[in-house]
Regions:
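Conserved polar/disulfide-associated segments of primarily extracytoplasmic proteins
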Residues: 55-189
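N-terminal targeting sequences that direct proteins away from the cytosol to non-cytosolic compartments
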Residues: 11, 15-67, 71-72, 161, ...
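Generic serine detector
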Residues: 5, 13-14, 20, 33, ...
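Sec-dependent signal peptide recognition
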Residues: 1-9
Length: 212
């Protein structure tokens, strides 16, 4: 997921970069990646594979995302698994990913930065963003996002230059907590409840993802 400083670079650029289709393959609850990284990513057997998308994000990064969900019979999403492979294009040699989260976790011997947040469905979305792409993919397959969600973002940097990353975002419907995104955000009347919800969410996310 690109940082805001990197996104600003695109406005002075007329670069057009082409991509082919997705490189990684998904079978059931498993993604197999032959490179960057060479890995097998396993999710719970209860997930449904929604599909994949690949495009050049803001003209500067080759992105390939795969979406999985756990949903009710009416296709209301209860849990979202968003797996994304991302690298800056060669035409932008000075760009690199920057993460400063003090929290880390290990999955399959890989070190991941850990961030969490809550989000309401009605919040504004950046045009052309990876979120716009994944939500369009979900809608096209008939799935509905919850009114409020909580997310864990796990990011593993693949190279010393910090130009390539594996990002896994796990999201859950907030409804079972009894709180809304606005209530749990800083300044909200239930923000003091967020630390425990946050810790439990990270634990669940870490337990649902296996990398070999």
């Amino acid at each position: 997921m690109l940082q805001a400083s990197a996104i600003l670079v695109i406005f002075g650029s007329s670069l057009l970069v082409q991509t082919s289709g997705p490189e990684r393959t998904a079978r059931g609850n498993v993604i197999v990646s032959a490179r960057e990284p060479k890995a097998r990513i396993e999710l719970p057997k209860t997930v449904e594979y929604v599909g994949a998308d690949r495009w050049v994000l803001y003209g500067i990064a080759d992105c390939e995302l795969h979406a999985f969900v756990e949903a009710d019979p009416n296709k209301n999403i209860q849990r979202l698994y968003w797996v994304q492979f991302e690298s800056y294009v060669p035409e932008k040699p000075t760009l690199k990913h920057e993460y400063n989260s003090p929290r880390h976790t290990d999955i399959g011997g890989m070190d991941f930065y850990v961030d969490t947040w809550v989000r309401a469905k009605a919040e504004q979305m950046r045009p052309g963003s990876d979120r716009e792409h994944i939500e369009a993919l979900l809608r096209a397959k008939g799935y509905q996002m919850p009114v409020n969600m909580m997310y864990v973002r796990l990011v593993h940097l693949l190279d010393e230059q910090k130009r390539k990353e594996l990002m896994i975002i796990y999201g859950e419907d907030l409804k079972p907590t009894g709180f809304t995104a606005a209530e749990l955000k800083e300044g909200g009347n239930a923000h003091d409840r967020w630390p425990k919800i946050d810790r439990d969410l990270i634990d669940r996310a870490s337990g649902k993802i296996r990398i070999r």
